[in-house]
Amino acid sequence: MLISIPKDVKYIIDTFYKNGYEAFMVGGCIRDILLNRTPMDYDIATSAPPEITEKLFKKTIPTGIEHGTITVLIDKNPYEVTTYRTEGTYSDNRKPDSVTFISDIKEDLARRDFTINAFAYNDRKGLLDYFSGNTDLNRKLIKCVGNPDKRFKEDALRMLRAIRFSAQLNFNIDEKTFAAIKVNSSSIQNISKERIRVELSKTLLSNNAFSGMIKLEESKLLKEILPYNLNLDNSIDKVNPNISSRLAFIFLNLEPSLVESIMRDLTFDKNTMNKVISLTSSFKDIKSPDSKADCKRLIIKVGKDNIFDLINIYESINSKSVPDITNLVKEILDSNEVLYIKDLAIKGNDLIKELDITPGKILGELLNHLLNEVINETIDNDYASLITCAKNYIQNS
């Protein structure tokens, strides 16, 4: 089987061979090529010790030298090059306590997580597939290399990766592999929240998010990482594939304070957290609007940048479009109608001068009153109308 090797990768492999060492393109990049997908990156395994890798290439970074990994830079493009190795015990369910560098590619591939990631290829020896990974690709099956219980005890993150690959590729999970996930599910607590966030996000953003979430539930992993009353429904696959919308969908049953706590715990960034909270807290307010003013207030509550994602979540759950809301929102936004105090045709300083009032609580109340009147379309957004309304408000206060 011939596989096209990118120029930079070929240069790295050829450099090792010219200097008496072996090297292969390995892992997920070969899986992706065999599935006619574009690899995100290319990893290389070699019989050369890491110090030799550093000598053979001009620009390198010792990213994981203690485990044999050197990043080689070719025209600023990074390629991870790792020495063939076996691994010692895993006392933390994440990283080996020790590694031993070896010269046998088959022994190196035997430590990989899944058969579909245990490939090696170069144009001298062709495709090496010692663990029937190609068969499992054709069977659309996620299966551990060797003993699945051992694989998951070595690295508990592999359990989330199995389900993530299943969702991304629309593959089933081998029965023994899935059974081992159930048995070892509690050990996911040994994995950092950041790594859990990354895998959960990839599952949620896949084309088969519902299937992935159900597998997380059935495997007992979900109760370990998100033990809450989540909204698990197949309509999630219709939700816009951005992480804020997908998270908001599964968190619809939860109070905003709990959503915030969960997202902080999982180390989500502040912008994503705020958007998810806006979407979940505003969902109950979306309905066929009684007036344009109601629609404006919905936009104000959820934010201009989030309103169409909110509509999309509503449409996904109800399996119907809501053109009356969508069209009204578009009309409001396209015509730049007043939504915020800053949109008013008058400023706080104008009111201070015209009405001889002092900055403070009364000024804030006055500006909010003017905004409500404009939103309700009881007055126009022009200077004269706003001043008249403001004077009346002050007189009646």
Task: Cite the ranges covered by each PLM segment.
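Catalytic cores of the polymerase beta-like nucleotidyltransferase superfamily
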Residues: M1-S397
